């Protein structure tokens, strides 16, 4: 969300108010040089300006990465939390917060630091999600990325609270109109998801959990350990919509020592 002015209300209706609007140049300078504007138009312009600054700072960066950096830098204000996240539960308050305010207000300064000297890792990568075997299409690749954790440093911090945030941004090709909209898998060409290894998993167990292809003959062998889904603030049911997914874990530093691997894998789309 970005500040684009406000409206005045009497409790029953709303109206534009110059004092709460943003100043801009007028389209007809013969009549007047300046005017006011409010709503989504100036908010869109500000978001575009922020994206342009990132492109300028880091030439060659992917558009998907620019979007990810802006979302990754966003934060909900206390007022947003108070109004929309009334019970702080994934199934209600946090869900309502995400639907009403998105991921919050982005910070251009923090977005730039994420590429510069903020503690973050940016990966620009690609995968082939599906392959054809005979007359059917099946899941193909997943990517596994390792965090360069300073394990000793995290261990030395002990119970100090830290936050790990992951943002996945990618391009989808919208479904052609002649395909129709029979179900939720028909609009995106392919969707992606991310998952983080849990403290009680080995790397082999983690691969088995997220990728059926590595399970061998026993396809029900999802490995030992658990997904640790309760660790996430939003949870997969809330974040896994659209083509950008962002979530975070608040944990002690020592508990994150072994959270070194993240998997990015495909799910259904109309390409398949």
Report each predicted region and the residues it spans.
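Active/binding-pocket-proximal capping segment
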Residues: 13-23, 67-73, 182-190
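Charged/polar, low-hydrophobicity segments characteristic of intrinsically disordered regions
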Residues: 79-103, 198-216
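An often Trp-containing, charged/polar helix-loop segment at the C-terminal end
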Residues: 59-84
